[in-house]
Amino acid sequence: MKERTIQPVNNGLNGNITIPGDKSISHRAVMFGSIAEGKTTIKGFLPGADCLSTISCFKEMGVEITQNGDEVTVVGKGLEGLQEPKAVLDVGNSGTTIRLMSGILANTPFFSCVQGDESIAKRPMKRVTNPLKQMGANIDGREEGTFTPLTIRGGDLKAIEYISPVASAQVKSAILLAGLRAEGVTAVTEPHISRDHTERMLEAFGVKVTREGKTVKLSGGQKLTATDIQVPGDVSSAAFFLVAGAIIPNSKLVLQNVGMNPTRTGIIDVLEKMGATFTVDLINEGASEPAANITIETSSLKGIEIGGDIIPRLIDEIPVIALAATQAEGITVIKDAHELKVKETNRIDTVVAELTKLGARIEATDDGMIIYGKSALKGNTVNSYGDHRIGMMLAIAGCLAEGKTIIEDAEAVGVSYPTFFDELQKLAK
């Protein structure tokens, strides 16, 4: 369990930074390329542990995948070409891999067993296994399909019209992917619109997808045709440096090639509402996945209320938004964020516990947290608990704190941002 020592940043963070590829898009590019017909080239791929787990799983099913840094080539097998894996499919720490891949495996006529690490073993799978069973999938797991390992014997499925109790792109995507080989029209309706990378990328691969309000539909029997994918930078990774630029004195950062998918840019809306000083320059308007260069500098922030429809658009950024709120004037209330409880950790509890160790005034609620602003942070020993987003949030907090901060289990950040600490060090010079 490696630890990192973070020293206070006295002269601010300054410079340009190219954000690594979007994790959600990288996963999907490998998966969709694997079930497409033809060769897909992916540029800007995120070579983090989670996305490498996706590559490993599809290689195990006979897909020829070549990876060289952030460029990946996938020779697709088509929807019917995957081979029965000889070994257990290990997703590591990746919830995206296990949930989306379950949708693909549910309609593939062979047996597979899927498992992950200790964190995955605690994460709820019934939200995916239940609708897949309704489609006719033979799928099981511990506690009646609630937890991994999952066993899946794929076969013929029937389309369903599913009303999801949660706004989850992973649930929606698993059902849509299962629907590719189901008989009829598969529809998913959500309480709020979740991130739409699956719909955008299916369309890029030639699949017709229909959107009507909060409902997404596709017809079974459509084939995927290989295409080249350019992955923009991950706005969830950019969020840590956006907040750092806003709250660390004497800072000015230019973040290049940040993904600006409107279902993901809640962090931008929140920083604007809090009063942050920044500019957004779109660089590829009209692309399937828009991107921008963002310039941000030290700002005077104010507390706000965050809840409702915006939560699915920033669920992964809430840990670092909470940190920003500790430096804002007034009180920030985050609500409607129950999903935080079923992430890599219970992020309500971990954010509150670890920021409290650093001197923040913050309280947990059932569906979020209340943060009292203008806290003077003091260095301490804190822990990521194996959660990459908690680790990065604590590193930014450490830059601001008085005295040194020691982060235990710091290597967890490699899941989504392998070069994070190197970038932080470079910007602090």
Curated annotation (Swiss-Prot):
3-phosphoshikimate binds at residues 23-24, 28, 168, 170, 316, 343. GO terms for molecular function: 3-phosphoshikimate 1-carboxyvinyltransferase activity. Its main location: cytoplasm. It is found in: Cytoplasm. Pathway: Metabolic intermediate biosynthesis; chorismate biosynthesis; chorismate from D-erythrose 4-phosphate and phosphoenolpyruvate: step 6/7. Belongs to the EPSP synthase family. Catalyzes the transfer of the enolpyruvyl moiety of phosphoenolpyruvate (PEP) to the 5-hydroxyl of shikimate-3-phosphate (S3P) to produce enolpyruvyl shikimate-3-phosphate and inorganic phosphate. It is an enzyme of class 2 (transferase). GO terms for biological process: amino acid biosynthetic process; aromatic amino acid family biosynthetic process; chorismate biosynthetic process. NCBIfam families: aroA (TIGR01356). GO terms for cellular component: cytoplasm. The active site is at residue 316. Keywords: Amino-acid biosynthesis, Aromatic amino acid biosynthesis, Cytoplasm, Transferase. Its EC number is 2.5.1.19. This is 3-phosphoshikimate 1-carboxyvinyltransferase. Transmembrane segments: none annotated. Pfam families: EPSP_synthase. Monomer. The lineage of its organism: Bacteria, Bacillati, Bacillota, Bacilli, Bacillales.
